[in-house]
A protein has these predicted regions:
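A short, well-structured edge-of-sheet supersecondary motif
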Residues: 1-33, 274, 280-284
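Active-site helix/loop module of the DD-peptidase/beta-lactamase fold
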Residues: 31-32, 37, 61-102, 133-135, ...
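Active-site SXXK
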Residues: 42-67, 95, 154-158, 206-209
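A small/polar active-site loop signature that marks catalytic segments
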Residues: 101-187
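Active-site-proximal alpha-helical segments within enzyme catalytic domains
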Residues: 150-157, 197-218, 271-287
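Active-site Gly/Thr loop motif
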Residues: 180-182, 187, 230-284
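Structured C-terminal helix/loop/strand segments within mature extracytoplasmic catalytic/sensor domains
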Residues: 265-311
Length: 311
């Protein structure tokens, strides 16, 4: 599939651009693409798919009743932020499917643009408050709008429902059970797990997560994720701003013929987890294509993989 491979000295690549301090500087080689130059690679928004898994496990364990529960039920300390009746009606499912209706602008600009809703959230002291301070733009459940902010609401919901941060909850309920031992999660200034983009994993362990979904939540015959939870992810394919890509519950989907779809968890810079159930395939790509270098574009690699499979 691949005719060429690329190796780069990330320190030299970042030398000209690494001018902003802090863990959310996307051009800081201490954080990106490897955590402190270890084998742990940034997952970026693939973290969102892990957060969705945490919600599914919390429902399985009885910590959360269902995805139809309003998010307000778990965000009591932010009750004054729910004066808008539309905001009060947002459910966990609305957040999972990126249809919360909260005004958010993230995909129309680079993540180094200070006007980005995501960048402004990450620069704030209280990420949850920042998200809830944004006005409602649409009725909940009606329109898709990609938002790292609503994933952070899910992070807070996990904490309130289980008493554990997403990082701690997944460690005992998922990672230990499928053999993920080395990882790192960033935290917000308030100590909440950065569930929208803060996970670092080794690529092999990301493949384990994909294999879990390929097998409908089973690992060595043991149910880690409810089978219905996995299947419900693709039960409703939501239109996005890209016609070829649909959305489920913190997962992307690529329909490639009348009856089949590929699953895709995707993150900034070239992080991709591709699952093709029809052919029992799990493929992992990592990179750091924040410089828009075409040769490093993992979507091109993904197209080659799908193309070779579907010939």
């Amino acid at each position: 599939v691949f005719e060429e491979s690329y190796k780069h000295n990330y320190d030299s690549l970042y030398e000209a651009t690494n001018t902003q301090p802090g863990q959310y500087n996307y051009y800081d080689s201490q954080w990106h693409p490897y955590f402190n130059k270890t084998g742990l690679h940034t997952m970026q928004s693939i973290s969102k798919s892990f957060t969705a898994a945490a919600i599914g496990i919390a429902i399985k364990n009885g910590h959360i009743e269902s995805v139809d529960v309003p998010i307000k039920s778990y965000l009591k300390e932010y009750e004054p932020s729910f004066s808008d009746k539309k905001k009060e009606a947002i459910t966990i499912k609305d957040a999972l499917t990126m249809r919360a209706g909260i005004k958010w602008d993230e995909l129309s600009m680079l993540y180094t643009d200070t006007t980005s809703s995501c960048v402004q959230m990450e620069a704030s002291e209280d990420w949850i408050q920042y998200v809830l301070d944004q006005p409602m733009e649409n009725e909940p459940g009606k329109k898709w709008e990609y938002s790292s902010g609503v994933t952070m609401l899910l992070s807070k919901i996990i904490f309130e429902a289980t008493g554990d941060n997403v990082s701690d909850y997944l460690e005992k309920e998922l990672f230990e059970k499928i053999g993920i031992n080395n990882y790192y999660w960033k935290q917000t200034p308030k100590g909440l797990t950065d569930a929208e983009g803060g996970l670092y994993l080794e690529p092999r362990d990301l493949a384990k997560f994909g294999y879990l979904y390929l097998n409908n939540g089973l690992w060595n015959g043991n149910s880690i994720l409810p089978k219905d939870w996995v299947k419900n992810n693709s039960a409703e394919l939501i239109d996005t701003i890209w016609p070829a890509f649909k959305y489920g519950q913190q997962w992307w989907f690529i329909p490639y013929d009348k009856d089949n779809i590929a699953w895709l968890a995707s993150g900034l810079g070239g992080q991709r987890l591709l699952i093709v159930p029809e052919f029992d395939i799990v493929a992992v790509f990592t990179g750091w294509n924040v410089y828009e270098i075409t040769a490093l574009n993992s979507y091109l690699a993904l197209q080659k993989v799908l193309g070779s499979i579907l010939k």
